[in-house]
Amino acid sequence: MSVSELYFIKILFLSIVQGVSEFIPVSSSGLLVIFENILQLKNNNLLINVTMHGGSLAAVVLFFFKDLINLWNNHKLLSNLIVATLPVVLVGGLLQYLGIIDQIMNIAVIGYATIFFGLLLFFSDKNKEEKFFTKSISHKDSFIIGLYQVLALIPGTSRSGITLTGARFLKFNRVDAAKFSFLLSIPTLSAAFVLGTYEIYKLEETSFNTLSLFAFLFSFLFSLATIKYFLIFLKKFSLNVFVIFRIFLGIILLTFYYTTH
């Protein structure tokens, strides 16, 4: 197998990891750190990163296409999504401008955050009372979930995980909480895709190629499958399996960090 073929396989594997981990309550950044080291691949390819996120964005838009079309008639859901999105836009924009996010992007932070927010997910999922978004959600609830989403700016938190945590603490049922979390991912994924595309445009010499097309396709397919089957999973099971996974993942990351520093 040639070097280029091996690189192709590695990128496709990372695309699968991106597609799956984007929509379940695990640390996608933690998983990528592990697999990038196992595969001896530091994925600093901006084009690949953008197309992978583009694949996840296309998947969630397709899955919730009817809901998105009906947003103009469902003013309550639209306004709640806007309210929940504003905190992360404002805080994230400020932190990005100050360069703080890049400063805290390291394996130790990812490891500790993976464990801590995994435990927080565990306690939030203990709520027995379950409310439904369509009947009970208020702008106050949406704003609180939006504040939880701000914590996703900490590497290792998991955006889907922390919004699920916030919704479960507010006693919303798992499936509705997940759907709201997925809809909330659209603005953040869109922002990442647009900003990334702009950076690619500024580079000028970067052009889309076969590898980026496959990265998009694999991320899209696995994102779509993950959304569908995760919602089915939540109808029958608790989030404990993801809590356990996060704790083990965090331990692996911290062990790797402290044995190499």
Task: Explain the meaning of each model-derived region.
Residues 1-261:
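Multi-pass membrane proteins that catalyze or facilitate reactions on polyprenyl-/lipid-phosphate substrates
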